[in-house]
Amino acid sequence: MARDEVRRMLPADIKREVLIKDENAETNPKWGFPPYERPIELHIQYGVINLDKPPGPTSHEVVAWIKRILNLEKAGHGGTLDPKVSGVLPVALEKATRVVQALLPAGKEYVALMHLHGDVPENKIIDVMKEFEGEIIQRPPLRSAVKRRLRTRKVYYIEILEIDGRDVLFKVGVEAGTYIRSLIHHIGLALGVGAHMAELRRTRSGPFKEDETLVTLHDLVDYYHFWKEDGIEKYLRRAIQPMEKAVEHLPKIWIKDSAVAAVAHGANLTVPGIVKLNVGIKRGDLVAIMTLKDELVALGKAMMTSQEMMQRSKGIAVDVEKVFMPRDWYPKLW
């Protein structure tokens, strides 16, 4: 992989090797539901939509519309977009609502149009913008809903797409909670002419991208109608991703069938239940606990490193924080 490609990665792009702890473990096909094989009702209940938010409404309004369109009681979005901003807005449905927490460490990508308030040579624009890659200090904008404390955020990459006079179109990958409006303001100050954000679109939120999974509100209306009125579920099934999509980027631990029900009932994960795990897990990391069918069981905080989980035969490996697996999908085997 070229250096430039490595540099243009979000945390969600990290490829993780797998360590096998128990080579003989198998899963019973009678139990559970592989993510892409759930009945459509369960697919919705445990689903996430990669929504293309239109400019205009608030993120909260868009979620309320989705609840009405799909006749849902609960839904939640992963990372607020300002009303004028369009693009990728992951919306988790019903039983999957709390999975949006998993998107926080994943990073986000935007395409922004910056308008400079004076003329600047292209080479200076390129050089100055490159300096904003890495750690930056920001204070949330006045219009922000959070307290205006100074905080550090990471800019993973900035890629200039086009410069047309005083207009600069660029792509930027950032840590969650980074304000692009503030970033542009500070780039303008560094260039000595000032600048403002003319337009903004989010193109990625962790594993959710501008790809074939991206759907509009109009799409959802049509697809729900096809299912309810005509019994055609394939379009709605394509528009709603399994909740497991939202944890693609997290370090994972796969567990035995015999351990699933215990974790689903809220028990912490102990070492004897582990079949395999990702390399590089550190104490305190947010991890996803998975079945051998790649179903999400729970999210939790690692209490051991990958190495410790491999070497030890007992002890608590993960402090379970959020359970997603229903208690009755796997039998009690303890």
Swiss-Prot record:
GO terms under biological process: box H/ACA sno(s)RNA 3'-end processing; mRNA pseudouridine synthesis; rRNA pseudouridine synthesis; snRNA pseudouridine synthesis; tRNA pseudouridine synthesis
Keyword Transport in annotation: no
Highest rank taxon of the organism: Archaea
Protein keywords: Isomerase, tRNA processing
PUA domain location: 250-325
CDD domains: PseudoU_synth_hDyskerin, PUA_Cbf5
E.C. number(s) listed in UniProt: 5.4.99.25
Enzyme's top EC category: isomerase
SMART domains membership: DKCLD (SM01136), PUA (SM00359)
Catalyzed reaction equations: uridine(55) in tRNA = pseudouridine(55) in tRNA
Annotated active site: D82
Gene Ontology molecular function, alphabetical: RNA binding; tRNA pseudouridine(55) synthase activity
Pfam families (alphabetical): DKCLD (PF08068), PUA (PF01472), TruB_C_2 (PF16198), TruB_N (PF01509)
Keyword Disulfide bond recorded: no
Family: Belongs to the pseudouridine synthase TruB family. Type 2 subfamily.
Purpose of the protein: Could be responsible for synthesis of pseudouridine from uracil-55 in the psi GC loop of transfer RNAs.
NCBIfam families: CBF5, PRK04270.1, unchar_dom_2
Protein name stated in the entry: Probable tRNA pseudouridine synthase B
Organism: Pyrococcus horikoshii (strain ATCC 700860 / DSM 12428 / JCM 9974 / NBRC 100139 / OT-3)
